[in-house]
Every structure is written in C-alpha cells, then in structure tokens.
UniProtKB/Swiss-Prot annotation:
The keyword RNA-binding applies. It comes from Streptococcus agalactiae serotype Ia (strain ATCC 27591 / A909 / CDC SS700). Gene3D superfamilies: 3.30.56.10, Bira Bifunctional Protein, Domain 2, Ferrodoxin-fold anticodon-binding domain, Nucleic acid-binding proteins, Phenylalanyl-trna Synthetase, Chain B, domain 3. It is found in: Cytoplasm. PANTHER family: PHENYLALANINE--TRNA LIGASE BETA SUBUNIT, PHENYLALANYL-TRNA SYNTHETASE BETA CHAIN AND LEUCINE-RICH REPEAT-CONTAINING PROTEIN 47. One of its GO terms (molecular function) is transferase activity. This is Phenylalanine--tRNA ligase beta subunit.
Length: 801
C-alpha cells in the first residue's frame, strides 16, 4: 500500500516528519517498508509555456520558443509528437538533473541551438505503468493555470513523500487512505476529518432502468447506480497526481473516480457503459465451464464453474472482483455509466485471480476483506464525484441485492484479563482513553466492560484482540519487562530431537544440504504428493494466493526451490528438509490438522562431475534409495520397498513405497516427467519419510545378541525371472523358505538384453548363512540352498541359471 503523505494530512492533522511517522507505525503494528520522494534527485525543472512551435523540415523535430519566466524566450528543440503551441510543459533548463542523475546542458541538434529539454514523465523517472495513457508516448502537458518559471514539483505532487506499507492479512483495513488515517489518528490521539460530497439525485429512478439478481452464494451483496449524460475526459491534475503517487495509471475521469474511491474507502468499484448492455438485468452468478470473456487487457479468458461473473442477457460482462470486460468498457463516447459496488467471497476471488495469474488492486482487497459499513457510502461518493468531474446526472437510488451486517461487533473482557496478559496495572480510565483514540465505543466497569468494534476493524472478534489493541496504542515500550523465573533442571533431548539429529547426520553425510521451505502453499500443491487423500486446510486471510493452504507434503515446496536454483544455472542439487506436514481428516473449519514430522530430500543433476578419469554420474533411483537404506541402517530398523504405481505425480516405474513392519511410512522415486515439466526442472528424485511413525518404533527396547565366534558362509544364486517379478517378491520367497540360518540377502546384479529372452531378466543374489553356536558344514548349506531354490521356483516361477 502506497500512502501519499500530502493526502494523509488532508484526512488527519499530523505534523511529524515521515521518518517519525514511519517509526511510530512500525512499532504499533503496521510495518513501513520505506519512504520515497518522487522529486528526489531532480532539480531545475520549471513550468514552460510554448509560445510558438515550428516543424523542422524533413525531420520529426520541432523548434519551440518557450516562456520559462525569464526575460527572454528560451529556444528548445523537441521531438515529442504531442508538442504544440499554447501548452504548458515541463522544461529542464541547463544545469537541471533528471532521472538517472542525467545533467542537462546547452547543445545543438541538427545545427539548432537548444537551451534545455522539454520532458516527459518517463524522463523524470516515473514508471511507464503509471503514466497517463494520453501522455505515454509524448511529453507531459501541465494544467492551463500553471505559471511559467514555477517549479513543476508542486503541480505534479512530485514533492510529496510516499510511505510504503507492508499490510498483513489481519490489517486489511489499512488498504485504504481512510483506514490509514484512522490508524494514524489513534497513534497520535487526533481526530479524522473525511471529505463529504453533496449528492443531488434526479427524479428518474435507477430501479426503473435496471435490476440486480444474485444467483451465487459467493456474492454477499451487489449494488448498482446509474449516472447519465457524463462527459468522458481526462481527470483534473490533482486526481491524476493522487493516483500516480499510489501506483495507479490515470485513464479517464470515470475510471479514475472508481480507482480514487478504491484508494479512499478500500471499496473496489467498476464502471460499465450502460449503452453497451444487451439487457437491463444485471446477474451476479457462477461462470459456466468453457465460458469465455475478453477482459479489459484484451486477453480472452477461459472460465470455469468456480469463477464469478457479472452477466447481462446471459453474457458475461465482467470477471467479478478481478477485472471488467472489454465489451462494456468506458470509452470517450460513453454517456451513461453503471457504477458497481459489491462484496464477493474472498476465497473465490483469490482462486480465480491466481488461476488466471490476473492480480489487481480490486482482487487483493476482496481477498483480504471489505468494510461492510461503507459499501453504500463509497457508491454515493463515486456518483457525486462523477456529477462534479464529468457533469453527470445521478438517477435516484441504488439498486441493491443482498443485505450486509453493518452494526458494530460487541466484544467483552475484564480489566483483570487485560492486566494479566500485559503484566500492567492499567485502570479502567486508561482503557477508555485507548478505545477513544481508536474510535471504539466502550461501556461497563472495571469488573467487566464491552467494546463496540466498528465494522471497519473486522480483525477484532475476541478479547485477545482487544488486549492487542490496548498494547499497541498504550505503547509496547511502556509494558513492564521481567526476567523469566524457572528453576535449573538437567536437560535432555526428546525422542524426536534425538531422531532428528540422527537423520540430519545421515543426510549431511550423504552430501545433502539442509533447506527450509514454506509451510504454506497453494491448495493444489498442498496435496500433490500426498499418499492418502485428506481435506485441505486453507487460511481465511492469506497474504498471497501462493501461500493460502497448509502443506500436506514437503516435496512440492522443495521442487519450487529446485526450480529456482535450476533457473539460475545451479543444476546439481542434493537438498533435504526435516519439517512438519499438516494432515486434515476432519472439517478444516472446526478441527485442527494433525502435525506429522517428515524427512524429505530431493536430488537432481550429477552425483559426480566428469573428470579426466571418470564419466559424469547422474542421479538415479538406486542412488536415492541408497540414502534411504543408509538412514534405516543407522536407525537399526528393517524396511522393505514395494513398487508403487498409484502416485500420480511420481514415475510409475521408478517409485517405491517404504514399509516398516508392513505399514507405509513414505516413498522414494523419480518425479513424473510431466510434473517435472510443470515445475520446469530436469529429472529429479525425491523421498519423503514419516518420522512421527518412526519415533514410536525408536522407543521400543533394543534386544542385543552375542557376537558369534563362528564364521559365516556365502553362496551366490542367479535367477531367470519374468520382468514383472519385483525384488521384494524374490526376497519374500527366500525369507519364507524355512531357512533359519539365513542372515543376509544382497542383490548384486540385474541384467536384461542379449542372451535373455524378451520379457525376462536375470537377477543375481548373494546369500549369507551363519550358525551362532557352531560351524556350518557344506552339507547343511547345500540343504539350505535346496529349500531356497524350491521356494523360488514355486513362488515366483524362477529358473536357476
């Protein structure tokens, strides 16, 4: 949120410096990112009046005689297409500084002396995105009343100071100038004074021209007004200045009024050309799958049923809460305007704007919340401004569907509750003073008091919120500080802390680097790599659409990190994270999710770089699986791997489920190529393991065995098998053969190709036998091998090679 200090001082009497104000606001709850002055670095820029303007033959140049308040006219050569006689312009005289610290000097252009430069706003350092359309390809034209020789800074409000606020979701009330004014007034104990407009309505009723119908529960309220006989023209300079200093491009007086009201009230508005409507009934409804709409930016949007649209005669004319449609755009010939002020479901707007990658000032405010109390007032204010700036005639009444609660919210607490939480000894009088500054009504006594919270502060709902407001306005610096009291105790690690340390040791020993990713993600990514379907826990007031749901896997966030690095030429990555995921089996609005500790890692690129002796070695499934095996060897747990084809985001032929005592605790494998393409990453292998389940196994008592003094005996066996037979199937057949002295099974070769029939493969195993109490004889080992061979033949149809 960009706040003009000049504009702010029109709303509340504050006479401190912007540096002091920024410090005070940051310490009371709204962080200030910085303060900038548009005129910083600029100098010697004055108003010039073009007395004459002659075209230079065979060039695009113009030779201008300019009055800059000096005794003589100043000759300036200008190439702008919109320069002409009789206009007031910005002139940088010799010695002036413009953008990028460029110094203007006297010079000659095509042999003609030029004593300065006629400037565009771009040349003063203003962003192309906020410059009025009429001046985007030429020089800025100043108001007719500008006096030659005067500094241009005050005419364009370039001497203003712009305060950039970082608004958190809980303080969306500060996404308006009135909201910021209320905050500043509370901090300094001042009163706000807001401009009021005198709205004069015609006898003709708006309800006789249009009607409004709501057909979606995502639309809480929809209001419309009609203003006829408007004259569409550029906005006055003061209005353009306010919009540009807030980061918004001026378009024309009608559109600019809606944006001005958005900045003033925080109420998004839209203006339709009524004459372009194909009907008289405005319908707010869900879009239909496959429905299309060309928005104001000229893009054709494919809509889905989750989107909201405003429709007339069953044809969409606006993407509700996000952007208007091109078919009803306000143009220079528009005469009758329909103003819209509505309240849409924030979650729906967030999903639509995120899906279409179409963020706007309106959508961000709908996502975070709207002040119900000023929707109607904002509409009337906009209509009055069109009456004033566009000569419009306002038809009588608003056409409204849907009722919004506007009464204050009652929140009660006690003085004891407040003082206990803050460690203070505040009196009821102190509390009254705080809420008087905030503009909240309070009644009651020290035993119990009730605060009437106006609708503009929809973030306050419980007594803890009242305590926060008291602390903010009373002053955090005034709260007493005490050292914590606790007896000295012998500390020890919890079982989870010990497990984390052991996992971290294995991971870093394998060359993995630890990272920390966001616990918040999109609803789609939240469940992307989940092994079981659970409900999604979404935030009510997310800061951004990309951080709106609690993750149920760590892999998706890790792939975002890999994509970020790969895009910056860092393509050999081995990273891990130990963090929580949030599984929700109940109602996300009523039940807390279950927090599950996980260990996740991702590998991409090369394991070993190419050198003069060896070839480059890329990451593969077995390298990733080896890290998992090393972990469980360290943890002294036996796990099995079973081929997994059910994870949509994982490669069906290179993914395995990890089982501990028959229970699924994770997976390891290659990210599906299509998923990798979506993330714009190369071939990547990942694993995610449930540490919470492992922790319960770690708490079991260990059983130690004596080290035997008798040697082990090994035998190799090679098998010809169908390709569909898995390693797990073979190990299971060997283990269930009834051989008690078998201590180890190790796969050391897999082959398919020449001399092997199509559809078959060769797998070779090393089997280890040992008797802890005696030496094994060859005859005993031979019997064991016979049993194993028989089991393999019967259970997996193996052929001994």
């Amino acid at each position: 949120m960009l706040v003009s200090y000049k504009w702010l001082k029109e709303l509340v009497d504050v006479d401190v410096t912007t540096a002091e104000l920024a410090e005070k606001m940051s310490t009371t709850g709204i962080e200030v990112e910085g303060v900038e002055t548009p005129a910083e670095g600029l100098s010697k820029l004055v108003v010039g009046h073009i007395v004459s303007c002659e075209d230079v033959p065979d060039t695009y140049l113009h030779l201008c005689q300019v009055d800059t308040g000096d005794d003589e006219l100043r000759q300036v050569v200008c190439g702008a297409p919109n320069v002409k006689t009789g206009i007031n312009v910005i002139v940088a005289v010799p010695g002036a500084r413009i953008a990028d610290n460029y110094k203007i000097k006297k010079g000659k252009i095509r042999g003609m002396e030029s004593l300065g430069m006629i400037c565009s706003l771009q040349e003063l350092g203003l962003s192309e995105s906020i410059i009025p359309k009429e001046f985007s390809d030429g020089i800025q034209i100043l108001p007719e009343g500008a006096i030659p020789g005067d500094s241009i800074f005050s005419y364009l409000d370039l001497d203003d100071e712009i305060i950039e606020l970082s608004i958190t979701p809980n303080r969306a009330d500060a996404l308006s100038m009135r909201g910021v004014a209320h905050e500043v007034a509370a901090i300094y104990g001042k009163k706000v004074h807001f401009e009021e407009k005198n709205l004069i309505e015609e006898a003709e009723r708006a309800a006789d021209k249009i009607s409004v119908v709501i057909e979606s529960d995502k639309v809480l309220s929809y209001s419309a007004r009609i203003v006829k006989n408007v004259t569409v023209a550029p906005s006055p300079q003061w209005l353009q200045n306010k919009l540009m200093n807030a980061g918004i491009r001026p378009i024309n007086n009608v559109v600019d009024v809606t944006n001005y009201v958005l900045l003033t009230y925080g109420q998004p508005m839209h203006a339709f050309d009524f004459d372009k409507f194909d009907g008289t009934t405005i319908v707010a409804r869900n879009a239909e799958n496959g429905e299309k709409l060309i928005t104001l930016d000229g893009e054709e949007r494919d809509l889905i049923a989750d989107d909201l649209v405003i429709a007339v005669n069953d044809q969409p004319v606006a993407l509700a809460g996000v952007m208007g449609g091109q078919s009803t755009e306000i143009g220079s010939s528009s005469k009758t305007v329909v103003l819209e002020a509505a309240v849409f479901n924030g979650t729906s707007i967030r999903k639509t704007s995120g899906r279409l990658n179409l963020r706007s000032e309106s959508s961000s405010r709908f996502e975070k919340g709207i002040n119900y109390d000023t929707v109607s007032e904002a509409m009337d204010f906009a209509a009055a401004m069109l009456q004033e700036l566009a000569g419009g005639q306002v038809l009588s009444g608003q056409v409204t569907e849907g009722v919004l609660p506007t009464e204050p919210v009652e929140v009660s607490t006690t003085l004891g509750y407040v003082n206990t939480r803050l460690g203070t000894e505040l009196t009821y009088t102190d509390i009254e003073e705080v809420f008087e500054k905030l503009g909240f009504a309070i009644s009651g006594s020290e035993v119990k008091f009730t605060v009437l919270v106006p609708r503009r502060r929809w973030d306050i709902a419980i007594q803890a919120d009242l305590v926060e407001e008291i602390a903010r306005i009373y002053g955090y610096e005034k709260l007493p500080t005490t050292l914590p009291e606790a007896g000295a105790t012998a500390g020890e690690l919890t079982s989870m802390q010990r497990l984390r340390r052991r996992v971290r040791t294995v991971a870093e020993g394998a060359g993995l680097s630890e990272i920390i990713t966001y616990a918040l993600t999109t609803p789609e990514k939240a469940v992307q790599f989940s092994t079981q379907a659970t409900n999604i826990t979404e935030l009510m007031w997310p800061m951004t659409v990309d951080r709106s749901a609690l993750r149920q896997n760590v892999v998706s966030g890790m792939l975002d990190t890999i994509a970020y690095n790969v895009a910056r030429k860092n393509s050999n990555l081995a990273v891990y994270e130990i963090g929580k995921v949030f599984e929700q089996t109940g109602n996300p609005k009523e039940d807390l999710p279950t927090e599950v500790e996980t260990f996740t890692f991702a590998l991409t690129g090369l394991v070993e770089e190419k050198d003069f002796q060896t070839k480059a070695k890329p990451v593969d499934f077995f390298y990733a699986k080896g890290i998992v095996e090393a972990l469980f060897i360290k943890l002294k747990l036996d796990v099995t791997f079973v081929a997994q084809k059910g994870l949509a985001s994982m490669h069906p032929g290179r993914t395995a489920t990890i089982l501990l005592d028959g229970k699924e605790i994770g997976f390891v494998g290659q990210v599906h190529p299509q998923t990798a393409k979506q993330y714009d990453i190369p071939e990547t292998y990942v694993a995610e393991i449930n540490l919470s389940t492992i922790e319960s196994q770690m708490n079991q008592a260990l059983i130690f065995e004596d080290i035997t003094k008798y040697p082990s005996v090994s035998r190799d066996i090679a098998l010809l098998l169908a390709e569909s037979v898995s390693h797990h199937d073979i190990v299971s057949a060997i283990e269930t053969s009834g051989v008690k002295r078998l201590t180890a099974i190790k796969l050391f070769d897999v082959y398919a190709g020449n001399n092997i029939a199509e559809g078959y493969k060769s797998m070779a195993y090393s089997l280890t036998f040992q008797n802890p109490n005696d030496n094994l004889t060859d005859e005993e080992v031979a019997k064991y091998m016979e049993k194993i061979t028989k089991s393999l033949v019967e259970k997996v149809n193996a052929e001994i090679r």
